[in-house]
Amino acid sequence: MFLLLKKLYITFARSSRIIITLVIIDQLSKWWFIDDLRWKPGLMLKVTSFLNMVYTWNYGISFGLMREYYQYSNAIFLITNTLIVCYLYYLMIRSKTIGSFAGYSFVIGGAVGNLIDRFFRGAVFDFIHFHYQNYSFPVFNLADCFITIGVIILIEDYYSTKKVIEEKAKGNYDNAQIEAMAEKIRNAGHNGDDIVN
């Protein structure tokens, strides 16, 4: 029990720096558009030929998906997103590589940023709009970017780890090499704690 509590504390101490930083960046960007610039829905700022800043409230999930179900979705999304964040945090505690730890931290940071919007404002504020000729990408925010980055990190980490396992199965790595790689991962980001088994 003590070891579990210790691991929970260590994971929280390390991940909170990343997560809180991402949440602050996300919320400051939204505050700047909503309160400081005092924009109103429908206003648009053309930044480049393919990038606009727009004022949009998203009543669905990331990138505006499922917004047509808003009349009964906000409470459901609040509960669902909270449960997802808790589950992701559980997975992060069990993470065995720096890549998965960082990936989960980014996804959680982005999810919490949007969760704050939904809890206090009833919807998520989106303002980044990419478009090219007749193609228009759904409007999103920095929290969505963090989630996407986190997913990319997790995918890359999964395939990197899978490659090492496959190479070991083929006999290309011996146990000493595997342990050396594990030790390198531990020392790189976890100060020697037993994150990699």
UniProtKB/Swiss-Prot annotation:
Q: What are the alphabetically sorted keywords of the record? A: Aspartyl protease, Cell inner membrane, Cell membrane, Hydrolase, Membrane, Protease, Transmembrane, Transmembrane helix
Which ranges does the record mark as transmembrane?
Answer: 73-93, 97-117, 135-155
Say which family it is in.
Answer: Belongs to the peptidase A8 family.
One annotated GO biological process? proteolysis
| PROSITE patterns the record matches | SPASE_II (PS00855)
**UniProt GO MF annotations:** aspartic-type endopeptidase activity
Chief location bin: membrane
Which pathway does the protein contribute to?
A: Protein modification; lipoprotein biosynthesis (signal peptide cleavage)
Q: Which Pfam families match?
A: Peptidase_A8 (PF01252)
Q: What does this protein do?
A: This protein specifically catalyzes the removal of signal peptides from prolipoproteins.
Q: How does it sit in the membrane?
A: Multi-pass membrane protein
User: InterPro entries from the xrefs?
Assistant: Peptidase_A8 (IPR001872)
- Top-rank taxon of the source lineage equals Bacteria
Catalytic positions are 126, 144
Cellular component terms (Gene Ontology): plasma membrane
Q: What is its EC number?
A: 3.4.23.36
Q: Output this protein's name.
A: Lipoprotein signal peptidase
Catalysed reactions, semicolon-separated: Release of signal peptides from bacterial membrane prolipoproteins. Hydrolyzes -Xaa-Yaa-Zaa-|-(S,diacylglyceryl)Cys-, in which Xaa is hydrophobic (preferably Leu), and Yaa (Ala or Ser) and Zaa (Gly or Ala) have small, neutral side chains
**Locations listed in the record:** Cell inner membrane
